[in-house]
Each structure stands twice: as structure tokens, then as C-alpha cells.
């Protein structure tokens, strides 16, 4: 996916995803100002992260936003995310 240099906001998810989060995310992405979205769920189970990631991946794809998973290459690969953010301690 090509990066649009006119829109370069990088959003990071909250640690907990509420039921209203998806609508809020859609409303933000509709503004066409975001290039990247990083899913960062440190305390959720793998199963729950997978379910959330699949929903958010579809939303990001619709709005042509690069979708990244935080600290979980296995999950990133499973949902076919655009990438995985790894901190220095994770390498």
C-alpha cells in the first residue's frame, strides 16, 4: 500500500476496545487524514485480539489506511495486516 504524504496521522488504539469504538474509528477515518492505524492490545487474549483485528482490518482496508499490529507477528500474519510494530525489547 502506498503512503499518501498529504495525510500522515498515525493512530494507536486504546488498550481496551469498547463496543462504540468501531463507529468512532469509521468516523475518524472518513475525514481522510489518517495514514496508519496500530492495534495495541496488551492485556487481551489472543482469541479476542484476533476477533478485534479482523474487524479493524476490514475498516482500515475500506479507507485505505495502513493497518499495523503491535508486538504480535503471529497475529499480524494471521489477519494479513500491513505490518507489525516491534519495540526494541521485542527484537
Q: What is each model feature region?
A:
Residues 1-91:
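Conserved N-terminal beta1-alpha1 strand-loop-helix module at the mouth
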Amino acid at each position: 500500500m502506498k503512503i499518501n504524504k498529504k495525510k500522515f496521522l498515525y493512530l494507536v488504539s486504546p488498550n481496551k476496545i469498547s463496543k462504540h469504538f468501531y463507529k468512532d474509528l469509521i468516523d475518524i477515518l472518513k475525514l481522510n487524514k489518517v495514514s496508519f492505524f496500530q492495534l495495541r492490545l496488551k492485556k487481551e487474549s489472543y482469541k479476542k485480539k484476533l476477533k478485534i483485528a479482523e474487524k479493524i482490518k476490514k475498516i482500515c482496508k475500506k479507507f485505505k489506511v495502513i493497518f499495523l499490529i503491535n508486538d504480535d507477528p503471529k497475529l499480524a500474519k494471521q489477519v494479513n495486516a500491513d505490518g507489525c510494530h516491534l519495540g526494541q525489547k521485542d527484537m
